[in-house]
């Protein structure tokens, strides 16, 4: 009787219980948890290895119904595709309750997200293949000493590559390298024109912009001077129309301009009207840099002046730029001495007008106190280029040369959009992903050859290691470093298993760092002259990211995931 009552009570409690969300917690002592975490990266490895080295990837974008083709040379778009894949996995998990209880899928997404965060922009076949191979070896021997051996092997490779990186300096060598890196003579000629415009000083990826053009041929536009990190004030449509920005898309003034720096928010028209009158009579334009905002009556006066001068064929215009402290290394206008010197402000930081502290309002009467000058400006709402030539006699405090650079815009031409997109992606990758990093910090042989060159040193490191399990970790690195070359030779040349092994053995035995065989029946070639190079900094960052991810995954003992709430539908 009592047993039956308890059974009924238990059934009643079960029916009336409230279901609550739980937080899945996984212990990494269970190796299956780590294997599930690696599953997402294995999927990524299949995608990357099958679309690298002259291969292409077909995918359907998020907001397009037709499939798109991504070349292996277009690293930026390939990285965006992987980000879209990660986002789609996360959205599917949030909207599908069944997937929330699917442990392998959940852990695979977590592992993939951590890997992408660690590897950052160095998403290559090398990073994915090394990570998967090294962790598979660790799963066989999950010991801390094995992890130490893996880290020691990766650090040895990084040191080895740093000591042997190849510096390419002469213009002839750079031109020869460009010839090998490009797919057509038109691409190489355009890249050489860009390099010549900047005197072959391509040491940053923000010097050259590659965009789609609207003609059948390529155009090179050079913007000299200070690359200002903010564009024209875009908070007022009437002001933008007064500069004809909606139609011309660009404000370009190639004559001497007055410069006025204003510390604070400019609202009162009386603070700017004397300057407007002075500039209109001189028929000169004004560059107004505001540390704050320009609004109210002041902006209205500026707009009216621009429209009036346009009707009267007066060249005077007022271009308003906002000063961004964050974009100027957290320097206030008064602290940014290099910028003040560049603008040729007559009294240094004392020429910055402050309505609270300055005794005089800028005008013709005190022009020698407030107004600087620049020789030309090119500006949009996104950025601006200010130019002043450096003259040691005219400017006692000479501006450092590093603050004056040529910024080149290369507009890619073609007969159709597909051709333009393909050429833009290839040229952009060559300039801003390969050449800029390689010319700045050095090159190493590509196709995984540089990793093969480190194998003799890894063997010595392994032989001198007294701890057996640490040797196992170094041996895992020895097994993993040949994988990038296997993928490269298979995808790029279509070699079979025996030919690939022969080429790998030849590269290991060749003592000269830049020399390697790329055909089973040929002699070793110089990778510098042959153009088979990649930036050292990219490989170094890749190895550092792999090491960080492995250390992160093997050092934690708990993985805590979350259950996503289904998005709520808001009633209209």
Curated annotation (Swiss-Prot):
Subcellular compartments: Mitochondrion inner membrane
Gene3D superfamilies listed in its UniProt record: GroEL, GroEL-like equatorial domain, TCP-1-like chaperonin intermediate domain
Principal subcellular localization: mitochondrion
Keyword Iron: no
Lineage of the organism: Eukaryota, Fungi, Dikarya, Ascomycota, Saccharomycotina
Segments crossing the lipid bilayer: 472-488
Originating organism: Saccharomyces cerevisiae (strain YJM789) (Baker's yeast)
Gene name linked to the record: TCM62
Side Mitochondrial matrix, residues: 17-471
The protein's name in its UniProt record: Mitochondrial chaperone TCM62
Similarity comment: Belongs to the chaperonin (HSP60) family.
GO function terms (MF aspect): ATP binding; ATP-dependent protein folding chaperone
SUPFAM superfamilies from the UniProt entry: GroEL apical domain-like (SSF52029)
Presequence positions on this chain: 1-16
GO biological process, one term: protein refolding
């Amino acid at each position: 009787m009592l047993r039956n009552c308890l059974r009924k009570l238990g059934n009643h409690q079960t029916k009336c219980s409230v279901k609550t969300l739980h937080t899945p917690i996984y212990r990494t002592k269970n190796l299956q948890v780590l294997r599930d975490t690696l599953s997402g990266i294995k999927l990524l490895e299949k995608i990357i290895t099958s679309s690298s080295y002259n291969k292409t990837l077909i995918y359907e974008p998020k907001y397009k119904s037709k499939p798109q083709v991504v070349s292996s040379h277009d690293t930026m778009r390939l990285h965006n595709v992987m980000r879209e894949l990660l986002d789609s996995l996360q959205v599917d998990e949030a909207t599908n309750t069944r997937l929330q209880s699917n442990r392998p899928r959940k852990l695979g997404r977590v592992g993939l997200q951590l890997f992408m965060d660690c590897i950052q922009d160095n998403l290559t076949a090398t990073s994915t293949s090394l990570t998967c191979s090294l962790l598979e070896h660790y799963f066989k021997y999950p010991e801390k000493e094995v992890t130490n051996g893996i880290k020691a092997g990766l650090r040895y490779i990084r040191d080895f590559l740093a000591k042997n990186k190849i510096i390419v300096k002469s213009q002839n060598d750079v031109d020869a390298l460009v010839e090998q890196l490009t797919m057509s003579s038109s691409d190489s000629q355009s890249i050489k024109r860009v390099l010549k415009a900047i005197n072959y000083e391509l040491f940053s990826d923000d010097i050259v912009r590659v965009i789609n053009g609207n003609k059948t041929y390529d155009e090179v536009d050079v913007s000299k001077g200070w690359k200002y990190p903010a564009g024209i004030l875009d908070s007022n449509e009437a002001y933008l129309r007064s500069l004809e920005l909606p139609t011309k898309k660009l404000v370009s003034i190639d004559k001497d301009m007055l410069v006025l720096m204003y510390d604070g928010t400019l609202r009162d028209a009386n603070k700017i009207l004397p300057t407007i009158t002075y500039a209109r009579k001189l028929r000169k334009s004004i560059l107004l840099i505001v540390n704050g905002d320009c609004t109210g009556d002041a902006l209205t006066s500026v707009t009216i002046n621009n429209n009036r001068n346009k009707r009267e064929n007066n060249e005077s215009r007022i271009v308003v730029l906002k000063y961004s402290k964050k974009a100027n290394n957290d320097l206030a206008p008064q602290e940014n001495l290099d910028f003040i010197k560049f603008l040729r402000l007559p009294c240094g930081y004392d020429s910055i007008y402050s309505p609270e502290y300055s005794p005089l309002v800028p005008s013709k009467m005190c022009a020698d106190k407030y107004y600087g000058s620049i020789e030309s400006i090119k500006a949009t709402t996104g950025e601006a280029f200010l130019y002043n030539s450096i003259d040691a006699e005219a400017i006692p405090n000479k501006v450092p040369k590093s603050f004056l650079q040529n910024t080149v815009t290369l507009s890619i031409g073609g007969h159709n959009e597909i051709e333009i997109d393909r050429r833009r992606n290839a040229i952009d990758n060559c300039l801003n992903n390969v050449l800029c990093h390689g010319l700045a910090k050095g090159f190493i042989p590509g196709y995984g050859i540089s990793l093969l060159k480190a194998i003799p040193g890894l063997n010595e490191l392994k032989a001198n290691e007294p701890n057996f399990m640490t040797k196992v970790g170094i041996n895992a690195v020895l097994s993993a470093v040949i994988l990038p070359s296997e993928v490269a030779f298979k995808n790029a040349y279509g070699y079979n298993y025996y030919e690939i092994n022969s080429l790998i053995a030849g590269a290991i035995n060749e003592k000269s760092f830049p020399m390697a065989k790329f055909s089973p029946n040929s002699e070793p070639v110089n990778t510098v002259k042959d153009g088979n190079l990649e930036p050292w900094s990219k490989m170094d960052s890749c190895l550092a990211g792999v090491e960080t991810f492995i250390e992160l995954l093997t050092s934690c003992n708990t993985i805590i995931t979350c259950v996503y709430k289904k998005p709520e539908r808001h009633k209209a």
